Amino acid sequence: MVRWLYSTNAKDIGTLYLIFAVFAAMIGTAFSVLIRMELAAPGVQYLNGDHQLYNVIITAHAFVMIFFMVMPAMVGGFGNYLVPVMIGAPDMAFPRLNNISFWLLPPSLILLLASAFVEQGAGTGWTVYPPLSGLQSHSGGSVDLAIFSLHLSGISSMLGAMNFITTVLNMRNPGMTLHKLPLFVWAIFVTAILLLLSLPVLAGAITMLLTDRNFNTSFYDPAGGGDPILYQHLFWFFGHPEVYILIIPGFGMVSHIVSAFSGKPVFGYLGMVYAMFSIGILGFLVWSHHMYAVGLDVDTRAYFTAATMIIAVPTGIKIFSWLATLYGGSLRITTPMLFALGFIALFTIGGLTGVILANASLDVALHDTYYVVAHFHYVLSMGAVFALFGGFYFWTPKIIGKTFNENLGRIHFWTLFVGVNLTFFPQHFLGLGGMPRRIPDYPDAFAAWNAISSFGSLVSVVATALFGYIIYDILVNGKPVDANPWAVPAFFQSTPEFWMESHTASSLEWALESPTPFHSFNMLPVQS
C-alpha cells in the first residue's frame, strides 16, 4: 500500500495513471450511454424530460473523458512510463512532484462527481459559459465545485508538464541529441509546452467566474461593465490548444506503431517533429473559430478561417508521412497496427469535417449542431481513443511482461470500429439537418439516424466490455514475453539481428527485459 501511495517511481506512477484512466473511462462511457439512450427515439425516454439532468450528464461526460481519461492515460500514463525509459533516464526530473501530480486527480474527480449531487448539478456543458454558469442560472454550489475540480486537475497537469519539459531537456542519455529523440517523446514534450501555456488562461477565466458568482465582481456581467464574450475568448484560448493536447501524444504513439509494423523508420522524422511543433503553435492562433456565431467582425472571421485551414497543412504532412512509412514496408497486421491504421483513416475524416467547419459562413449554420459533435468525436473518439488502444496493445507486453490474445484483440478492434462509426457517422446528417446539440428531445424527422446512432453506441459498449475481459485475460492467461515481443527473426544472416539492432523497433524501451525492471538502467545507455 505504502509503495503505491508514496511512490516516486515513474513506472509506478504511470501505472496508477493508467488504472485511474480505466476507472474514469467506465464512468465517462456510462454517461455517454445514458445520453445515447435518451436520444434513441423522439420524446422522453429515460430522464423524465429533465433537460437540466441531461445537460449535467453531457457536462460530466465531457469533463470525465477529457480530464480524467484521455489526459491521464496519454500524458500521465504512457508519458510517465515511456519517456524516462525512451531517453535513457533513471526516472523523471522531479519524482515527488510526479507523485502529487497524480494524487491531485482523484480528489479532482470526486469534486466533479460531487457537483452533480448538490442542488441540480452543473448543467452548463463543458464550456461553462456565463451567464448560464452565473449565479442567476445556477444558484447553489454545483458550478463552484466543478470550478474547483478544474483547478485541481489543471494544477496536476501543469506540474506534470513542468516535469516533462525538465526531464526531456536535461535528462537525456549521452549521445541522444534532440534530433534523435523518439517521436513519442517529442509528442509529450510539445504537449507539455501547450499545457503550460494554455492552462493558466483557463485558471484565470474560471477564477474570475468564481468571483463573479461568490464575491460580487462583474467580469462577465454586462450590468457591471463586464462582458460574457470575454469568458469565451479566455476559455477557447485554452480550449483549442487543449484538443491538440489530447491528440498530439496519439500522433507520437501512432508513429511508433506504424514504424514498428512497417519494418522501417518513420518517413520524414524531422518533418514529423516540426509538424507537431507547427500544430502546437498554430493551435494558439485559431481559438475564435469556436465563436463565429457570437458576432465577430467580418475581418476577424476571415482571419480565423484562414488560420484554421493552415493547421490542416502540418496535419496533412503527418498523415502523408505515415502513409509513406507504410508504402513499400513489409506490413504485419497486428492488433496495434489495426488501431493505428484505423486512427489514420478516421482521423483524416475528422480532419476533413474540421476544414469544412473552419469556414465562418458555413459554421454559422452548423454551429452547435450535431455536425460539430460528429467532427470532434471523429478526432477524439476515433483519433485519441484508437491511438490509446493501439498504444495499449503495443506496450502492454513490455509493461506487464505478458502477451495478449491476438484474436480477441482483433475482435475488439473490429467491434469498436463498427460501433463508433455507426454512432458518429449518422450525426453528420443530423447536423446538416439542423439538429441542435445538448437538447434531450428532437423532432420526429431525426428519429431514424438517431436510432442508428444509439445502436452504434451499444456496439461500442460491447467492444469496451470485451476490452475489460482482454485485460483480465492478459493478467491471468498471458504468456511471458521477450525483451522485444514484436521482433521478427532476421533471415539470411549469421547473427540473429534482433539481438543487435531491431528493424521492428528502434527506441530504447525494447532493449530492457519485459516487464521493465523497477530501476530501468543501472548504467546509462549511450546512443551513437
Swiss-Prot record:
Root EC class: translocase
Binding site for Mg(2+): 367-368
Alphabetical keyword list: Calcium, Copper, Electron transport, Heme, Iron, Lipoprotein, Magnesium, Membrane, Metal-binding, Mitochondrion, Mitochondrion inner membrane, Myristate, Respiratory chain, Translocase, Transmembrane, Transmembrane helix, Transport
Residues bound to Fe(II)-heme a: 61, 377
Positions with a binding annotation for O2: 244
Cross-link (1'-histidyl-3'-tyrosine (His-Tyr)): 240-244
Residues where Cu cation binds: 240, 289-290
UniProt-listed Gene3D superfamilies: Cytochrome c oxidase-like, subunit I domain (1.20.210.10)
Cofactor(s) the protein requires to work: heme; Cu cation
CC terms in the record's Gene Ontology section: mitochondrial inner membrane; respiratory chain complex IV
NCBIfam families referenced in this protein's UniProt entry, alphabetically: CtaD_CoxA
Protein's UniProt name: Cytochrome c oxidase subunit 1
Organism: Mycosarcoma maydis
